[in-house]
Amino acid sequence: MSSVTMRQMLEAGVHFGHQTRYWNPKMAPFIFGERNKIHIINLEQTLPLFNDAMNYLGKLAGNGGKILFVGTKRSARDTIAEEALRCKMPYVNHRWLGGMLTNFKTVRESIRRLKDLELMREDGTFNRLSKKEALMRTRELEKLERSLGGIKDMNGLPDAMFVIDVGYEKIAVKEANKLGIPVIAVVDTNNSIEGVDYVIPGNDDAMRAIQLYVSAAADAIANAQVTSRATAAPAGDDEFVEVREGAEASKKKATVKKKAAPRAASGESAEAAAE
């Protein structure tokens, strides 16, 4: 379970929705009331839903799943990149390119081009080009890095997608829905919960609120990864012992063979192994 409390949510402004005139009726069950023509989100509903979402992310990460972090609006960009890198997950924090998931084969070609350009920069190829060519390659590299840098090591479709602001990232959500990829998302009062598997009702504009959501998600993933590695460690030790015992048995068998007659060797080695 997440360690985030209701007080922390209040302090981060998670409960502040949008102006009442922009509300989406499908968010009605999560609205507590209104103040100064601003909808107030019911944190008594948000907190358990938030915990469910974090638990799901943790279980998925513990089983080796990949979670794609998506937040391209200005207030979310830096936090998305920092926290996704911290828990070693892919991310998109600039403009979502149409087909980034549904046409991933083509995107892979662009990623390959990005890696080629990075290699050219590192091995000094750029320095051997004319100024004009070097500038063109540098600009191409920067453009690809900005749009694809966060997913260049993803190697395949993600197992889930964590989204800040489903309205702003509606194309990403649609692509995930089309491919059957679960969506965990922060949904404000002006957006619909359709297409979202794990809804987190909350403010999707305030930087402090965004930092709270994303850092908690990264914590859940990182903690699950550590626990998974710790649980897997004893299994590795057992396997090593079995190999060592097998080697000793083979050595014992070889010794018996050397002493015994050829016809009796197999029987005596079996008895030695049984002992």
From Swiss-Prot:
Q: Which residues cross the membrane?
A: none
Q: Which domain of life is it from?
A: Bacteria
List where Low complexity composition bias occurs: 262-275
Q: Carries keyword Ribonucleoprotein?
A: yes
Q: Which SUPFAM superfamilies match?
A: Ribosomal protein S2
Protein name per Swiss-Prot or TrEMBL: Small ribosomal subunit protein uS2
Any one GO molecular-function label of the UniProt entry: structural constituent of ribosome
**Spans of biased composition, class Basic residues?**
252-261
Q: Give GO terms for biological process.
A: translation
Q: Which family does it belong to?
A: Belongs to the universal ribosomal protein uS2 family.
Organism name: Thioalkalivibrio sulfidiphilus (strain HL-EbGR7)
Q: Is the keyword Thylakoid in the record?
A: no
Q: Where is this region: Disordered?
A: 244-275
Gene3D superfamilies in alphabetical order: Glucose-6-phosphate isomerase like protein, domain 1, Helix hairpin bin
Identify the keywords attached in UniProt to this record, alphabetized.
Ribonucleoprotein, Ribosomal protein
Q: Which GO terms describe its cellular component?
A: cytosolic small ribosomal subunit
PROSITE patterns named among the record's database cross-references: RIBOSOMAL_S2_1, RIBOSOMAL_S2_2
